[in-house]
Amino acid sequence: MLIIPAVDLRGGRCVRLFQGRADQETVYSTDPVAVARTWEEQGARRLHVVDLDGAFTGKPQNSGVVLDIVKSVNIPVQVGGGIRNPENVKCYLEHGVDRVILGTAALTNPEFLDAVVAAYGERIVVGVDCRDGRVCVQGWEQTAATDVLPFLEELVRRGVRRVVFTDVKRDGTLEGPNLEEIARVAAHTELKVIASGGVSRLEDLRALKKLEHLGVDSVIIGKALYAGTITLAEALALERKEKDNVGQEDHSLPRCEPGPRG
């Protein structure tokens, strides 16, 4: 399972919000580029960058900082927040962003989603942000009437292959991920799922690892890293240990003996 550190941007700073609320902000750094470099230096293999101002206003507000991050690291960067037209998508992807994450626009503008999926394929990811089983839009400030499972089915029909699933009530709380809902979402379709929201300890990562067979192949960690309840080194060590264990199990499988020749 891939561990992905989060870098959330607001007013050019690196921040974390509690349950996505704009009025409950903690500033962790005034230099998001340095933060991104630190995560890379500590071994991260991908970064998750969110333009919170963009999510709230409906258009990118921190794109300069985003592109500075992309230029400053040598690992893939996925970006979301306020990306609601083809020009936004094209600009980011042509300037080195690896994946673009669509939120509100994926629900409200399906023709736009169709167009960018047709043009860019798996570089388009949809952020499925939920509260009580319903999809949230407009920077999580509104909860749509759309139930999450039919929405996932619609995404599959439109060619989407990967989603970032966030339980809004858990995000930034350090209360642990909503494992039951993540499992329900992952089991419902063949979509690859990046889990996000609530991770606070290594036990949470171990529990998410058990959902890998359902398609949960990555996890975004935000506040836990900034608050120090998990270090990136610990998370990556767990990731490596799981890989090593899988390798050992593979080598210990009994050999198949050749059958009789006909």
Curated annotation (Swiss-Prot):
EC annotation? 5.3.1.16
Active-site annotation: D8 (proton acceptor), D129 (proton donor)
Give GO MF terms, alphabetically. Answer: 1-(5-phosphoribosyl)-5-[(5-phosphoribosylamino)methylideneamino]imidazole-4-carboxamide isomerase activity
Query: Domain of life here?
Result: Bacteria
Naming one, the record's GO cellular component terms include: cytoplasm
From the UniProt entry, list the residue stretches annotated as the region Disordered.
243-262
Q: Any keyword Metal-binding? A: no
Q: Name its pathway.
A: Amino-acid biosynthesis; L-histidine biosynthesis; L-histidine from 5-phospho-alpha-D-ribose 1-diphosphate: step 4/9
User: Where is this protein found?
Assistant: Cytoplasm
Keyword annotations for this protein?
Answer: Amino-acid biosynthesis, Cytoplasm, Histidine biosynthesis, Isomerase
- What is the enzyme's class at the highest EC level? isomerase
Task: Enumerate the InterPro entries for this protein.
Answer: Aldolase_TIM, His_biosynth, HisA_bact_arch, Isoase_HisA-like, Isoase_HisA-like_bact, RibuloseP-bd_barrel
Question: What GO terms describe the biological role, i.e. biological process, of this protein?
Answer: L-histidine biosynthetic process; L-tryptophan biosynthetic process
Q: Name one Pfam family in it.
A: His_biosynth
Catalyzed reaction equations: 1-(5-phospho-beta-D-ribosyl)-5-[(5-phospho-beta-D-ribosylamino)methylideneamino]imidazole-4-carboxamide = 5-[(5-phospho-1-deoxy-D-ribulos-1-ylimino)methylamino]-1-(5-phospho-beta-D-ribosyl)imidazole-4-carboxamide
Family designation: Belongs to the HisA/HisF family.
Which HAMAP family does the record associate with it? Answer: HisA
User: What is the name of the protein in this document?
Assistant: 1-(5-phosphoribosyl)-5-[(5-phosphoribosylamino)methylideneamino] imidazole-4-carboxamide isomerase
Q: Which organism is it from?
A: Desulforudis audaxviator (strain MP104C)
